[in-house]
């Protein structure tokens, strides 16, 4: 057993008793953000903090069979002392999913029930209080449990209920730790076998699903122990405010959606090519245990090159980044020159899924989404309209098909037809003068 008693060191030292307004004690506690105001349980893919880089390196080196992290919840009121978040089972390899369903979860819930500690799955409310419906949490790889799945292990996260007495929360967390150890002691061999098989399955897989979300078409019923909820006039605003009446217990069944599906599925390449110009990307791959081959001599490779055609960016910074989302790409097969010092990420390993989640530009928690490649999004060279006008006219005169495309665009887009500069830029983008590296994603997919 390896224990990290203080992960967020600077945050733990920022003692206070006021900043967790939803929380019932203790008298003093730490702060969520580290010295750079980063939430470390959003940092596992981007690894901005030294804290996370140290922990990921330790996980890679030690390779535990189960990872467990302890938290305090921040959400709805109910009668359960503990909420349990497990790496979403639909995202796990089938062998690990079976172990979780057959051994881990039954063992944990049975232990906690024997200790008279109420425990429920970690959830998100759908529309108001819990009785209106609950959804499971799809833990992307920015979170410790989602990242653990990509390293081929089950991740657990305890969320003791913030309004329960502090001593009870501590005991519940301790008992869940003991329960986990008991399951591992009893079923350790099955767990190790499951992990080995999961690694082999990942290495042999031809494709992986990415960007998972809750399947809203599948609903079950979950036994629920809560409190009657109602709306009362707010003493502050006078408007309706949610209120839980702890004098009125409620035992019922609530709608429960906890099946996840990927929104895209991508086939594996033979390898990824990461140019040496991106050392911060290579460093993170290495820390996560992804096998790398350094190119020793110049050679040519046939690759799939992706160009970013569209993306959205959040308006407010999140964990030190302006996240990209809704990424669209086009793909071309080209030949590129590999230089000594460039890095190949070969597939055929248990880390294949982790590498794909890091390196694919459409992956919602990948390096492109976190802004690691933002410099390729900026166009460096432009044109003066009075200079390019004659060049554009000559290009159109020599290429009837290009002129037809321009005329078609003008006939279907009135705003475009009324904008002389946009029409020149349209021609410029299709000319030899347009820089080939603009929006060209630097990481290539090797085909051989």
Language model: regions and residue ranges:
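Structured catalytic-domain cores with a bias toward divalent-metal coordination
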Residues: 1-448
């Amino acid at each position: 057993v390896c224990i990290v008693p203080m992960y967020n060191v600077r945050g733990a030292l920022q003692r206070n008793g006021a900043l967790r307004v939803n929380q019932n004690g203790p008298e003093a506690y730490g702060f969520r953000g580290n010295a750079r105001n980063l939430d470390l349980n959003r940092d596992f893919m981007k690894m901005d903090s030294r804290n996370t880089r140290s922990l990921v390196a330790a996980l890679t080196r030690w390779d535990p069979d189960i990872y467990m992290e302890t938290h305090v919840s921040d959400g709805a009121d109910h009668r359960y002392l503990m909420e349990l978040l497990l790496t979403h089972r639909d995202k796990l390899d089938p062998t690990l999913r079976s172990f979780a369903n057959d051994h881990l979860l039954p063992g944990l819930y049975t232990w906690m029930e024997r200790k008279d500690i109420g425990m429920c799955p970690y959830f998100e409310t759908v529309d108001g209080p819990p009785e209106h419906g609950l959804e499971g949490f799809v833990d992307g790889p920015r979170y410790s449990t989602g990242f653990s799945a990509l390293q081929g292990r089950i991740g657990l996260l305890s969320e003791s209920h913030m309004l329960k007495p502090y001593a009870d929360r501590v005991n519940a967390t301790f008992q869940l730790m003991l329960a986990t150890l008991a399951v591992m002691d009893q079923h350790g061999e099955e767990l190790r076998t499951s992990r080995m098989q999961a690694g082999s399955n990942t290495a042999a897989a031809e494709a992986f699903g990415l960007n998972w979300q809750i399947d809203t078409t599948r609903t079950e019923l979950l036994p629920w122990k809560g409190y009657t909820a109602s709306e009362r006039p707010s003493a502050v605003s006078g408007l309706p405010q949610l209120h839980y009446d702890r004098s009125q217990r409620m035992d019922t069944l609530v709608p429960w959606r906890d099946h996840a599906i990927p929104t895209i599925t991508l086939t594996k390449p033979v390898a990824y090519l990461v140019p040496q110009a991106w050392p911060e990307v290579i460093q993170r791959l290495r820390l996560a245990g992804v096998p790398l081959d350094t190119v020793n001599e110049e050679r040519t490779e046939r690759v799939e090159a992706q160009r970013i055609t569209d993306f959205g960016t959040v308006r407010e910074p999140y964990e030190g980044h302006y996240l990209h989302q809704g990424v669209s790409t086009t793909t071309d097969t080209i030949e590129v020159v590999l230089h000594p010092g460039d890095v190949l990420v070969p597939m055929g390993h248990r880390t294949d899924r982790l590498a794909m989640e890091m390196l694919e530009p459409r992956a919602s928690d990948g390096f492109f989404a976190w802004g690691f490649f933002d410099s390729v999004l900026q166009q460096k060279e432009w044109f003066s309209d009075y200079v390019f006008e004659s060049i554009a006219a000559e290009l159109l005169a020599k290429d009837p098909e290009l002129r037809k495309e321009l005329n078609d665009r003008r006939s279907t887009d009135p705003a475009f037809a009324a904008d002389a500069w946009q029409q020149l830029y349209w021609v410029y983008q299709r000319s030899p003068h347009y820089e080939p590296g603009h929006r060209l994603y630097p990481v290539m997919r090797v085909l051989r």
